[in-house]
Amino acid sequence: LTVIGRDPIVGQKRIMTEARFMTKAAAGPLPDLWNDAHAADLDEPGLLLYRSNLLGSDLRITNFGGGNTSAKLTMTDPLTRKPVTVLWVKGSGGDLGSMKRDGFSTLYLDKLESLKQLYRGIAHEDEMVALFNHCTFNLNPRATSIDTALHGFVPHPHVDHVHADAVIAIAACSNAEELTEKVFGGAIGFLPWQRPGFDLGLKLGAMAAEHPEYVGVVLGGHGLFTWGPTSKAAYQTTLRIIQQAADWLAGHEKQPAFGGPRRDAAAPETRRAVAAALMPLIRGKISRDERKVGHFTDAPEVLEFVNSRALDRLAPLGTSCPDHFLRTKIRPLVLPYDRQGDNVDTLANSLDALLAAYRDDYSAYYQRCKRPNSPDMRDPNAVIYLVPGIGMFSFAKDKATARIASEFYVNAINVMRGASGVSAYVGLPEQEAFDIEYWLLEEAKLQRMPKAESLAGRIAYVTGAAGGIGGATALRLLGDGACVVLADIDHAALDARIQAVVQKFGRDSAVGIPLDVTDEASVVASFQESILAYGGIDIVVSNAGIASASPVEDTSLALWQKNMDVLATGYFLVAREAFRLMQRQQCGGAIVFVASKNGLAASVGASAYCAAKASEIHLARCLALEGAPHGIRVNTVNPDAVLRGSKIWAGEWRQQRAASNKVSEDELEEVYRQRSLLKLSVLPEDIAEGVYFFASDLSAKSTGNILNVDAGNAQAFTR
């Protein structure tokens, strides 16, 4: 097992297996993580939350955001002070593995039951969702899920609904009902595919009532419902049924999987190199209207599928479970790298035609299936890109969405593997898939989402990110929605910085990459790592720095060269790689140099530093000329005397400057404050604001410019 992800409330990890259907031993049995000692201290809602977090902690049980749980509990009515039965059910949105107690909606069960009298038939079932609000218990603001009726009408106290790959594999077979009987021996019922809603809730409730011997029901093409008398019993039943399905599949699937390999996977380094070459090209071509962020995986199950004989047959069939194609679109785009001689340039030259063909196909699908009240067609570009020999890319509005889409398509691969191994895999009918994708209730959910932040979909690369200015800049860009690559030569400081950033913004928001800007190979490698992490780069902030002070007669060649290596050559190497990438990506870009007042104003005893900083400023001007035809803007922010949080000012440079000004180190910041025209201290956050201005569309018509952030220094006035 490979452990990834997060800690639910009892410290369990989210788990993903690399081969769920190979053998029971290979996949490993689902662990029963229920802890009686922990559970003993919980009330009934707490037990429901505990069960939910446990189920959501394992991707074999349910995917991110998928599934829901419920409990029918006796509570005191706040108006009558009498006991009433209340349905606690996971609300709309959220994720079982990470949800909190406020993630449940609560409804009077008798009021929910009374809605049956108002139901006008399947053509009108969407109107029932609004009526759920009239059943709310205790003014709970949590929006109710479309699956509420499926939980409420099952006549059992505790109900689980999950999207386990092993069960969906059976549910997506052409003979799913027959296999359900064969696998579970009459303990589990079967309902054919139907869009979730009030009507399916009535059918599920009726089946559970008519068959007291059932402990659950398989929903065709969708997933599993199970139930029990207690939270623990329901949880253990869910585990047992999923394990039973996985064991049966492992014992009956045909070998080799997917008809065997059509080709071998490329070597790992080749896969990474090809991915780094292709992802910016794709990203640029699909980001014309909205910037996309990418995700790359070459996990074993992905390689098995993209390299298989069954790829061309199965990929066009689309996914089955609604949760899958809501994230991944109905089908992926296969990029025929293997049929073009494993040649990246050949594939790159055909990308425009391949992407256009996918968009045309998606548009035709929309036109075939749309209804009079369907929402307008959404982005017609693919989300999932399969590359034989290489792996899978996914692109979406942000990193988390792209990663989760990738995880969902891995779920779909597992389902196709299991179903095709024991029967024939069947995707959802096209019209059914469309009706889910363009469901008015789903559209309403999209419309409720907050407006995107100003840097949403942008990817920034910041050097010197472990220091004061670099760290503040990273936080500023992250705060406005960018994904950020934090690069620094100080591994320990970088690790501490990235941990703090991830703690605040989440694991998809940022990556840390060790970088020596004076080492060409290190710079090139850091850009490849950045592409593999996010698919490209839009914003580059060159901020890596050193500082030195020495009279010219005492300045050694080594000291001179060190300043030039870091502050001139380092900025050149980063800018060159940025230009190469941004030109391939073809959607412009913003490069910001963090230089210094000393690049404009001469300073006694710091000739090497001043000359190197002047080099940065003029290099930026030259790059602005070269970048303009490509939409690449290059600007400079000039700080002065930013002491707080600075690694540069923490060492000899501070001592030297204090000695030069004939004050103590503690008095130095006040000296600089009084020296400024505005009598203000300049902080890292002030520089970050300047960088943000040049990185964002606020300065869309600005290039080749210098912004002094120094509280006013007449020597540095640009002329």
Regions found by a protein language model. Give the residues of each.
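Active-site helix of classical SDR
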Residues: 575, 612, 620
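Substrate-binding pocket helix/loop in short-chain dehydrogenase/reductase
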Residues: 551-552, 556-561, 672
